[in-house]
Amino acid sequence: MAGLSRILLSCTLACLLAGQAAQASVDDPTRAGGDNRVRALRADQARRDVLLTACRDDPGHRRGEPDCVNAERAQALQQWQAAAMTSVDAAFSDLAGALRNAAPRRMEAAIVRLTRQLQPLVYSMMTLLVLLTGYALLARRDRPFEWHIRHALLVAVVTSLALSPDRYLSTVVAGVQDVAGWLSGPWTAPDGAAGRGGLAQLDQFAAQAQAWVAQLAGQAANDANPGSAVNWLLCAMIVAASAGGWLCLAASLLIVPGLIVTLLLSLGPLFLVLLLFPALQRWTNAWLGALVRALVFMALGTPAVGLLSDVLAGALPAGLPQRFATDPLRSTMLAATLCATATLMLLTLVPLASSVNAGLRRRLWPNAAHPGLAQAHRQAAARQYAPRPAAAAAAAGPHQAGTYAASATPAPARPAPSFPAHAYRQYALGGARRPPPRVRRDDRPAPAPDRRVLPRKPNLP
């Protein structure tokens, strides 16, 4: 994390320096006046044609005059927009279309078609659940009352879900959409309009990046100098790579967690059935853990994308397409650095979400085994307080160590639960620990004792 913080600090300083330099270049009164005249000539095509004709007729005397320079710049800007590369335009159009097509209704229809095939399996599991519950009610009448209530509620839930799977799936998808809309609600559009979703902000940024890359690629195509054309093409590739990386990562953080949550909730009834089988309850715990992890990424990713989209839109200069014509390298580095900084800040969400997920799992399932330092500490504590078989074997003697090691270190017995429901809950949460395996007994006979008579030591005075 130290290296990542240094990278973020360096990118932030570079953005600040580039922004100050770009602002200083824009605030120059001579350049501002030139930009205004270029815009006027770009709008007035007749005057621009007259100036270009006069400059071409007398290139020796009027080539370096401001009017000729402004007319050529206006003509170049007009040509750059008209001569955008078809491949780049198509690529960004496909990306924007993919963002627009990731609509909730399409996702809902796909999930409904996918899970509708599981309806016979849901009916079979529901029938098996009813039969098992009836068998338990008839064969084991000593069950506590809460056990019957829990299983009756489980049967009712699974039966209702099996009778109306489409309505259940539509409710799940609508709930996930409402949660995603509520998470992205506080973030407004850069121009002060009403609140919009994160996909709309990414679509607007994709359109802006498409215009930038088309302008740079068009200048590279129209430049007669090969060296300058290569420079323009490199600038276009830098902007396309940085903007494309930001768009892909932001879109994945917006779409993938919601899709995973919807799929897990749609398959929830199948995992609820597993609560009846003690050996399969860990699958339900794994399903709950995956659902919590996806909800954490959804709760952190959607606001982060909205916030960074607003920051990125506010940090980018307003007249960036015009600056690409006057100062392409500085404008390219400014746009690329801002996009790279936003991408790195999104990447820091992964360890943050992992730590939050680990904390939630420790709070929700305190007795479950967790990977990492917590499990290592628990294993070390168990080894510290466990009886030591080596000391007991040494006390038993060298020959009886293998035979009586198991009896010298008895295995701790499982504590008897106070009532069956407590044992059921403890086993379901993973709190009940099986006793450790007994030490393997050495059934070989002990060696015969040495009965030889040893010489006695003389009694010396």
From Swiss-Prot:
Keywords: Cell membrane, Membrane, Signal, Transmembrane, Transmembrane helix. It comes from Bordetella bronchiseptica (strain ATCC BAA-588 / NCTC 13252 / RB50). Residues 376-411 have a biased composition (Low complexity). The keyword Phosphoprotein does not apply. Residues 376-461 are annotated as: Disordered. Residues 1-24 form the signal peptide. It is found in: Cell membrane. Residues 439-453 have a biased composition (Basic and acidic residues). This is Type IV secretion system protein PtlD homolog. The keyword Protease does not apply. InterPro entries: Conjugal_tfr_TrbL/VirB6. One of its GO terms (biological process) is protein secretion by the type IV secretion system. The chain crosses the membrane at residues 118-138, 232-252, 253-273, 294-314, 333-353. GO terms for cellular component: plasma membrane. Pfam families: TrbL. It is a multi-pass membrane protein.
